[in-house]
Protein backbone atom coordinates (compact mmCIF):
# COMPACT_ATOMS: atom_id res chain seq x y z
CA UNK A 1 0.00 0.00 0.00
CA UNK A 2 2.83 2.42 0.82
CA UNK A 3 4.29 1.75 -2.62
CA UNK A 4 1.02 2.61 -4.38
CA UNK A 5 0.46 5.71 -2.23
CA UNK A 6 3.99 6.94 -2.88
CA UNK A 7 3.81 6.40 -6.62
CA UNK A 8 0.32 7.94 -6.79
CA UNK A 9 1.59 11.10 -5.11
CA UNK A 10 4.50 11.36 -7.55
CA UNK A 11 2.29 10.88 -10.60
CA UNK A 12 -0.35 13.23 -9.21
CA UNK A 13 2.31 15.95 -9.09
CA UNK A 14 3.41 14.91 -12.55
CA UNK A 15 -0.05 15.19 -14.11
CA UNK A 16 -1.06 18.35 -12.26
CA UNK A 17 1.89 20.11 -13.86
CA UNK A 18 1.34 18.42 -17.23
CA UNK A 19 -2.31 19.48 -17.38
CA UNK A 20 -1.42 23.03 -16.35
CA UNK A 21 1.15 23.07 -19.16
CA UNK A 22 -1.77 22.98 -21.57
CA UNK A 23 -4.57 24.81 -19.80
CA UNK A 24 -2.75 27.45 -17.75
CA UNK A 25 0.85 28.31 -18.50
CA UNK A 26 0.44 29.33 -22.16
CA UNK A 27 -2.00 32.04 -21.06
CA UNK A 28 -0.30 32.90 -17.79
CA UNK A 29 3.27 33.21 -19.08
CA UNK A 30 2.97 33.92 -22.80
CA UNK A 31 -0.20 35.98 -23.30
CA UNK A 32 1.27 38.14 -26.07
CA UNK A 33 2.01 35.34 -28.56
CA UNK A 34 -0.25 32.93 -30.42
CA UNK A 35 -1.65 29.98 -28.48
CA UNK A 36 0.21 27.28 -30.44
CA UNK A 37 3.63 28.87 -29.93
CA UNK A 38 2.81 29.55 -26.28
CA UNK A 39 1.93 25.88 -25.77
CA UNK A 40 5.20 24.81 -27.39
CA UNK A 41 7.11 27.11 -25.02
CA UNK A 42 5.15 25.65 -22.12
CA UNK A 43 6.07 22.12 -23.20
CA UNK A 44 9.73 23.17 -23.37
CA UNK A 45 9.47 24.11 -19.68
CA UNK A 46 7.71 20.80 -19.03
CA UNK A 47 10.75 18.90 -20.35
CA UNK A 48 13.14 20.55 -17.87
CA UNK A 49 12.21 18.09 -15.12
CA UNK A 50 13.27 15.15 -17.28
CA UNK A 51 16.61 16.81 -18.03
CA UNK A 52 17.14 17.33 -14.30
CA UNK A 53 16.34 13.76 -13.25
CA UNK A 54 19.69 12.13 -14.14
CA UNK A 55 21.47 14.95 -12.31
CA UNK A 56 19.18 14.39 -9.35
CA UNK A 57 20.07 10.71 -9.29
CA UNK A 58 23.77 11.55 -9.05
CA UNK A 59 23.16 14.01 -6.20
CA UNK A 60 20.71 11.93 -4.19
CA UNK A 61 22.62 8.66 -4.56
CA UNK A 62 25.50 10.37 -2.78
CA UNK A 63 23.14 11.69 -0.10
CA UNK A 64 21.74 8.18 0.35
CA UNK A 65 25.20 6.64 0.65
CA UNK A 66 26.40 9.15 3.22
CA UNK A 67 23.28 10.06 5.21
CA UNK A 68 20.92 7.13 4.71
CA UNK A 69 17.71 6.36 2.87
CA UNK A 70 15.44 8.20 5.29
CA UNK A 71 17.31 11.49 4.97
CA UNK A 72 17.49 11.12 1.20
CA UNK A 73 13.77 10.47 0.84
CA UNK A 74 12.82 13.25 3.26
CA UNK A 75 14.91 15.85 1.41
CA UNK A 76 13.58 14.68 -1.96
CA UNK A 77 9.90 14.76 -1.02
CA UNK A 78 10.23 18.10 0.77
CA UNK A 79 11.90 19.53 -2.33
CA UNK A 80 9.11 18.09 -4.45
CA UNK A 81 6.46 19.55 -2.17
CA UNK A 82 8.10 22.97 -1.94
CA UNK A 83 8.62 23.17 -5.71
CA UNK A 84 5.00 22.22 -6.31
CA UNK A 85 3.61 24.58 -3.67
CA UNK A 86 5.72 27.44 -5.03
CA UNK A 87 4.12 27.01 -8.45
CA UNK A 88 0.71 27.58 -6.87
CA UNK A 89 1.82 31.12 -5.90
CA UNK A 90 3.40 31.87 -9.27
CA UNK A 91 2.67 35.37 -10.62
CA UNK A 92 2.04 35.74 -14.32
CA UNK A 93 3.61 37.67 -17.17
CA UNK A 94 1.26 40.58 -16.53
CA UNK A 95 2.68 40.99 -13.02
CA UNK A 96 6.44 40.46 -13.40
CA UNK A 97 7.04 39.86 -17.10
CA UNK A 98 9.31 37.03 -18.22
CA UNK A 99 10.70 36.68 -14.70
CA UNK A 100 7.66 34.45 -14.17
CA UNK A 101 9.04 32.07 -16.81
CA UNK A 102 12.36 31.81 -14.99
CA UNK A 103 10.62 31.18 -11.67
CA UNK A 104 8.56 28.38 -13.17
CA UNK A 105 11.68 26.91 -14.79
CA UNK A 106 13.41 26.84 -11.40
CA UNK A 107 10.42 25.11 -9.80
CA UNK A 108 10.24 22.59 -12.62
CA UNK A 109 13.93 21.76 -12.29
CA UNK A 110 13.36 21.34 -8.55
CA UNK A 111 10.58 18.86 -9.28
CA UNK A 112 12.86 16.87 -11.57
CA UNK A 113 15.68 16.71 -9.05
CA UNK A 114 13.23 15.67 -6.34
CA UNK A 115 11.60 12.94 -8.42
CA UNK A 116 15.02 11.38 -8.95
CA UNK A 117 15.69 11.53 -5.23
CA UNK A 118 12.33 9.94 -4.45
CA UNK A 119 13.57 6.66 -5.96
CA UNK A 120 13.50 4.32 -2.96
CA UNK A 121 13.93 0.89 -4.52
CA UNK A 122 10.46 -0.26 -3.53
CA UNK A 123 9.45 -1.26 -7.04
CA UNK A 124 12.66 -3.21 -7.57
CA UNK A 125 12.34 -4.82 -4.14
CA UNK A 126 8.81 -5.98 -4.89
CA UNK A 127 9.83 -7.47 -8.22
CA UNK A 128 12.89 -9.25 -6.83
CA UNK A 129 11.38 -10.47 -3.54
CA UNK A 130 8.20 -11.92 -5.02
CA UNK A 131 7.77 -15.66 -5.56
CA UNK A 132 8.97 -16.73 -9.00
CA UNK A 133 5.44 -17.39 -10.20
CA UNK A 134 4.21 -13.95 -9.01
CA UNK A 135 6.99 -11.55 -10.05
CA UNK A 136 4.95 -9.95 -12.80
CA UNK A 137 2.07 -9.42 -10.40
CA UNK A 138 4.23 -7.72 -7.78
CA UNK A 139 6.09 -5.65 -10.38
CA UNK A 140 2.74 -4.32 -11.57
CA UNK A 141 1.63 -2.88 -8.23
CA UNK A 142 3.73 0.33 -8.13
CA UNK A 143 2.63 1.10 -11.70
CA UNK A 144 -0.94 1.58 -10.52
CA UNK A 145 0.21 4.95 -9.20
CA UNK A 146 0.12 6.37 -12.74
CA UNK A 147 -3.59 5.91 -13.51
CA UNK A 148 -4.61 6.74 -9.95
CA UNK A 149 -2.53 9.93 -10.03
CA UNK A 150 -3.96 10.84 -13.43
CA UNK A 151 -7.53 10.32 -12.21
CA UNK A 152 -6.99 12.63 -9.24
CA UNK A 153 -5.26 15.36 -11.25
CA UNK A 154 -7.68 15.26 -14.17
CA UNK A 155 -10.69 15.17 -11.86
CA UNK A 156 -9.58 18.32 -10.06
CA UNK A 157 -8.87 20.21 -13.27
CA UNK A 158 -12.10 19.01 -14.90
CA UNK A 159 -14.06 20.34 -11.93
CA UNK A 160 -12.43 23.76 -11.85
CA UNK A 161 -12.46 24.21 -15.64
CA UNK A 162 -16.16 23.35 -15.78
CA UNK A 163 -17.29 25.18 -12.64
CA UNK A 164 -15.43 28.48 -13.10
CA UNK A 165 -15.37 31.12 -15.76
CA UNK A 166 -12.23 31.21 -17.90
CA UNK A 167 -11.10 34.39 -16.16
CA UNK A 168 -11.55 32.94 -12.66
CA UNK A 169 -9.87 29.67 -13.60
CA UNK A 170 -6.81 31.44 -15.02
CA UNK A 171 -6.72 33.85 -12.08
CA UNK A 172 -6.98 31.50 -9.11
CA UNK A 173 -8.82 28.24 -9.89
CA UNK A 174 -5.81 26.46 -11.39
CA UNK A 175 -3.81 26.98 -8.19
CA UNK A 176 -5.90 24.63 -6.05
CA UNK A 177 -4.65 21.38 -7.64
CA UNK A 178 -1.11 22.46 -6.76
CA UNK A 179 -2.17 23.08 -3.14
CA UNK A 180 -3.67 19.59 -3.05
CA UNK A 181 -0.48 18.16 -4.54
CA UNK A 182 1.52 19.60 -1.65
CA UNK A 183 -0.87 18.05 0.91
CA UNK A 184 -0.71 14.68 -0.86
CA UNK A 185 3.09 14.83 -0.76
CA UNK A 186 3.07 15.32 3.01
CA UNK A 187 0.85 12.26 3.49
CA UNK A 188 2.98 10.21 1.09
CA UNK A 189 6.17 11.26 2.87
CA UNK A 190 5.06 9.86 6.21
CA UNK A 191 3.57 6.71 4.63
CA UNK A 192 6.82 5.91 2.86
CA UNK A 193 9.07 6.84 5.79
CA UNK A 194 7.15 4.45 8.04
CA UNK A 195 8.12 1.66 5.66
CA UNK A 196 11.59 2.73 4.54
CA UNK A 197 12.85 3.28 8.08
CA UNK A 198 11.87 -0.15 9.41
CA UNK A 199 14.49 -2.80 10.13
CA UNK A 200 12.60 -5.33 8.02
CA UNK A 201 12.78 -3.08 4.95
CA UNK A 202 16.49 -2.46 5.44
CA UNK A 203 17.14 -6.18 5.82
CA UNK A 204 15.23 -6.96 2.63
CA UNK A 205 17.16 -4.31 0.70
CA UNK A 206 20.43 -5.73 1.99
CA UNK A 207 19.40 -9.28 1.10
CA UNK A 208 18.66 -8.19 -2.46
CA UNK A 209 21.76 -5.98 -2.56
CA UNK A 210 19.62 -2.90 -3.25
CA UNK A 211 22.09 -0.34 -1.92
CA UNK A 212 23.15 2.93 -3.56
CA UNK A 213 26.54 2.96 -5.23
CA UNK A 214 28.44 5.65 -7.07
CA UNK A 215 26.73 6.50 -10.36
CA UNK A 216 30.07 6.87 -12.12
CA UNK A 217 31.32 3.52 -10.80
CA UNK A 218 28.12 1.85 -12.00
CA UNK A 219 28.44 3.43 -15.47
CA UNK A 220 32.02 2.21 -15.81
CA UNK A 221 31.02 -1.31 -14.82
CA UNK A 222 27.63 -1.76 -16.47
CA UNK A 223 26.95 1.33 -18.58
CA UNK A 224 25.88 -0.78 -21.55
CA UNK A 225 23.04 -2.26 -19.54
CA UNK A 226 21.82 1.25 -18.76
CA UNK A 227 21.56 2.04 -22.48
CA UNK A 228 19.79 -1.23 -23.30
CA UNK A 229 17.50 -0.84 -20.29
CA UNK A 230 16.61 2.74 -21.19
CA UNK A 231 15.47 1.67 -24.66
CA UNK A 232 13.52 -1.40 -23.50
CA UNK A 233 10.42 0.55 -22.32
CA UNK A 234 10.70 3.30 -24.96
CA UNK A 235 7.47 2.30 -26.73
CA UNK A 236 5.68 2.57 -23.39
CA UNK A 237 7.07 5.97 -22.51
CA UNK A 238 6.49 7.32 -26.03
CA UNK A 239 2.84 6.32 -25.70
CA UNK A 240 2.64 7.65 -22.13
CA UNK A 241 2.52 11.35 -22.97
CA UNK A 242 0.78 10.83 -26.29
CA UNK A 243 -2.38 9.64 -24.51
CA UNK A 244 -2.17 11.83 -21.40
CA UNK A 245 -0.73 15.29 -22.15
CA UNK A 246 -0.48 15.69 -25.92
CA UNK A 247 -4.15 14.91 -26.81
CA UNK A 248 -5.34 17.61 -24.40
CA UNK A 249 -3.19 20.16 -26.22
CA UNK A 250 -4.37 18.97 -29.64
CA UNK A 251 -8.04 19.08 -28.65
CA UNK A 252 -7.65 22.48 -26.98
CA UNK A 253 -5.93 23.98 -30.01
CA UNK A 254 -7.61 22.27 -32.95
CA UNK A 255 -10.93 20.78 -31.79
CA UNK A 256 -14.34 22.01 -30.71
CA UNK A 257 -14.37 19.86 -27.56
CA UNK A 258 -14.16 21.70 -24.27
CA UNK A 259 -11.17 20.86 -22.04
CA UNK A 260 -13.49 19.80 -19.22
CA UNK A 261 -15.31 17.28 -21.40
CA UNK A 262 -12.09 15.87 -22.78
CA UNK A 263 -10.57 15.50 -19.32
CA UNK A 264 -13.57 13.38 -18.33
CA UNK A 265 -12.97 11.22 -21.41
CA UNK A 266 -9.34 10.80 -20.36
CA UNK A 267 -10.47 9.83 -16.87
CA UNK A 268 -12.50 6.99 -18.37
CA UNK A 269 -9.38 5.99 -20.29
CA UNK A 270 -7.35 6.01 -17.08
CA UNK A 271 -9.92 3.69 -15.50
CA UNK A 272 -9.36 1.28 -18.39
CA UNK A 273 -5.64 1.60 -17.78
CA UNK A 274 -6.08 0.43 -14.18
CA UNK A 275 -7.65 -2.78 -15.48
CA UNK A 276 -4.94 -3.41 -18.08
CA UNK A 277 -2.11 -2.64 -15.63
CA UNK A 278 -3.54 -5.32 -13.34
CA UNK A 279 -3.96 -7.66 -16.30
CA UNK A 280 -0.31 -7.15 -17.25
CA UNK A 281 0.75 -8.72 -13.97
CA UNK A 282 -1.24 -11.88 -14.59
CA UNK A 283 -0.18 -12.09 -18.24
CA UNK A 284 3.51 -11.55 -17.45
CA UNK A 285 3.42 -14.42 -14.96
CA UNK A 286 2.06 -16.67 -17.71
CA UNK A 287 4.26 -15.74 -20.66
CA UNK A 288 7.16 -13.75 -19.16
CA UNK A 289 7.91 -10.03 -19.01
CA UNK A 290 10.17 -10.01 -22.05
CA UNK A 291 7.48 -11.60 -24.19
CA UNK A 292 4.80 -9.24 -22.88
CA UNK A 293 6.94 -6.17 -23.52
CA UNK A 294 7.59 -7.39 -27.06
CA UNK A 295 3.89 -8.04 -27.71
CA UNK A 296 2.97 -4.63 -26.27
CA UNK A 297 5.55 -2.93 -28.49
CA UNK A 298 4.09 -4.72 -31.50
CA UNK A 299 0.59 -3.59 -30.56
CA UNK A 300 1.81 -0.01 -30.10
CA UNK A 301 3.43 -0.20 -33.54
CA UNK A 302 0.09 -1.31 -35.02
CA UNK A 303 -1.70 1.43 -33.08
CA UNK A 304 0.67 4.02 -34.56
CA UNK A 305 -0.95 3.54 -37.98
CA UNK A 306 -4.50 4.23 -36.77
CA UNK A 307 -3.71 6.85 -34.10
CA UNK A 308 -3.53 9.81 -36.54
CA UNK A 309 -6.81 8.78 -38.16
CA UNK A 310 -8.52 8.61 -34.78
CA UNK A 311 -7.22 11.98 -33.61
CA UNK A 312 -8.41 13.56 -36.86
CA UNK A 313 -11.78 11.79 -36.66
CA UNK A 314 -13.70 14.24 -34.51
CA UNK A 315 -15.10 13.55 -31.06
CA UNK A 316 -15.78 9.88 -31.75
CA UNK A 317 -12.33 9.23 -33.15
CA UNK A 318 -10.61 11.11 -30.34
CA UNK A 319 -12.57 9.11 -27.78
CA UNK A 320 -11.49 5.90 -29.49
CA UNK A 321 -7.87 7.08 -29.46
CA UNK A 322 -8.03 7.66 -25.71
CA UNK A 323 -9.68 4.33 -24.87
CA UNK A 324 -7.37 2.24 -27.05
CA UNK A 325 -4.31 4.26 -26.08
CA UNK A 326 -4.85 3.99 -22.35
CA UNK A 327 -5.65 0.29 -22.65
CA UNK A 328 -2.39 -0.37 -24.48
CA UNK A 329 -0.48 1.87 -22.11
CA UNK A 330 -1.59 -0.12 -19.08
CA UNK A 331 -0.56 -3.40 -20.67
CA UNK A 332 2.93 -2.08 -21.48
CA UNK A 333 3.48 0.23 -18.50
CA UNK A 334 2.50 -2.44 -15.99
CA UNK A 335 5.80 -4.29 -16.55
CA UNK A 336 8.09 -1.45 -17.63
CA UNK A 337 9.76 -1.09 -14.23
CA UNK A 338 9.89 -4.77 -13.28
CA UNK A 339 12.01 -5.50 -16.31
CA UNK A 340 14.74 -3.04 -15.39
CA UNK A 341 16.03 -4.33 -12.05
CA UNK A 342 16.73 -7.84 -13.32
CA UNK A 343 19.25 -6.53 -15.86
CA UNK A 344 21.90 -5.49 -13.32
CA UNK A 345 24.22 -7.43 -11.06
CA UNK A 346 23.41 -7.18 -7.38
CA UNK A 347 25.96 -4.50 -6.50
CA UNK A 348 24.71 -2.04 -9.11
CA UNK A 349 21.03 -2.98 -9.20
CA UNK A 350 19.73 -0.08 -7.09
CA UNK A 351 21.67 2.70 -8.81
CA UNK A 352 21.42 1.13 -12.25
CA UNK A 353 17.65 0.80 -12.05
CA UNK A 354 17.27 4.43 -10.96
CA UNK A 355 19.48 5.87 -13.69
CA UNK A 356 17.96 3.63 -16.36
CA UNK A 357 14.49 4.83 -15.39
CA UNK A 358 15.62 8.47 -15.57
CA UNK A 359 17.10 8.04 -19.04
CA UNK A 360 14.09 6.11 -20.33
CA UNK A 361 11.75 8.90 -19.22
CA UNK A 362 14.05 11.52 -20.73
CA UNK A 363 14.43 9.86 -24.13
CA UNK A 364 10.94 8.41 -24.48
CA UNK A 365 8.63 10.84 -22.72
CA UNK A 366 10.37 14.06 -21.74
CA UNK A 367 10.18 15.78 -25.11
CA UNK A 368 7.21 13.86 -26.54
CA UNK A 369 4.55 16.60 -26.19
CA UNK A 370 6.91 19.28 -27.52
CA UNK A 371 8.20 17.26 -30.47
CA UNK A 372 4.88 15.76 -31.53
CA UNK A 373 2.90 19.01 -31.22
CA UNK A 374 5.59 20.88 -33.15
CA UNK A 375 5.75 18.29 -35.91
CA UNK A 376 1.99 17.76 -36.08
CA UNK A 377 1.25 21.47 -36.36
CA UNK A 378 3.81 21.82 -39.15
CA UNK A 379 3.56 18.56 -41.08
CA UNK A 380 0.26 17.00 -40.05
CA UNK A 381 -1.11 14.66 -37.43
CA UNK A 382 0.73 11.68 -38.98
CA UNK A 383 3.69 12.75 -36.81
CA UNK A 384 1.93 11.10 -33.86
CA UNK A 385 2.11 7.74 -35.61
CA UNK A 386 5.72 8.24 -36.63
CA UNK A 387 6.75 9.01 -33.04
CA UNK A 388 4.96 5.95 -31.67
CA UNK A 389 6.40 3.72 -34.37
CA UNK A 390 9.94 4.90 -33.62
CA UNK A 391 9.44 4.12 -29.92
CA UNK A 392 8.14 0.64 -30.71
CA UNK A 393 11.10 -0.01 -33.01
CA UNK A 394 13.55 1.01 -30.27
CA UNK A 395 11.88 -1.30 -27.76
CA UNK A 396 11.94 -4.28 -30.11
CA UNK A 397 15.60 -3.62 -30.96
CA UNK A 398 16.50 -3.38 -27.27
CA UNK A 399 14.70 -6.62 -26.45
CA UNK A 400 16.49 -8.34 -29.32
CA UNK A 401 19.90 -7.38 -27.93
CA UNK A 402 19.04 -8.02 -24.32
CA UNK A 403 19.24 -11.59 -23.06
CA UNK A 404 18.86 -11.03 -19.33
CA UNK A 405 15.13 -10.47 -19.17
CA UNK A 406 13.58 -13.79 -18.34
CA UNK A 407 11.33 -15.31 -20.98
CA UNK A 408 9.24 -17.41 -18.63
CA UNK A 409 9.49 -17.06 -14.88
Task: Explain the meaning of each model-derived region.
Residues 55-69, 277-289:
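Helix-to-loop junctions at the C-terminal end of transmembrane segments
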Residues 66-78, 286-297:
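Cytoplasmic membrane-interface "Motif A"-like loop-to-helix N-cap segments
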Residues 78-96, 298-313:
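C-terminal ends and interior cores of transmembrane alpha-helices
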Residues 97-116, 317-331:
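Hydrophobic core of transmembrane alpha-helices in multi-pass small-molecule transporters
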Residues 146-192:
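Helix-loop-helix hairpin linking two adjacent transmembrane segments in secondary transporters
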Amino acid sequence: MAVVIGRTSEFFDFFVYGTASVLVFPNLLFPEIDRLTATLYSFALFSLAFLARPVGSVIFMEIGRKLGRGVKLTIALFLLGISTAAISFLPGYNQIGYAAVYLLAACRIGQGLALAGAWDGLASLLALSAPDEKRGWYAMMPQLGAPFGFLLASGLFAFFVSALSTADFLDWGWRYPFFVAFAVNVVALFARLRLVMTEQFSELLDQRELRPTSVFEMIRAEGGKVIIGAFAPLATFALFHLVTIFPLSWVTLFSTQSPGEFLVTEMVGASIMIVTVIASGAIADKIGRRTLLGIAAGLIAAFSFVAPLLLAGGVGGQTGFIMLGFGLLGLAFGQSSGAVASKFSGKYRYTGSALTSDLAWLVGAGFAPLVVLGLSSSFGIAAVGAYLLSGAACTLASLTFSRQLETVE
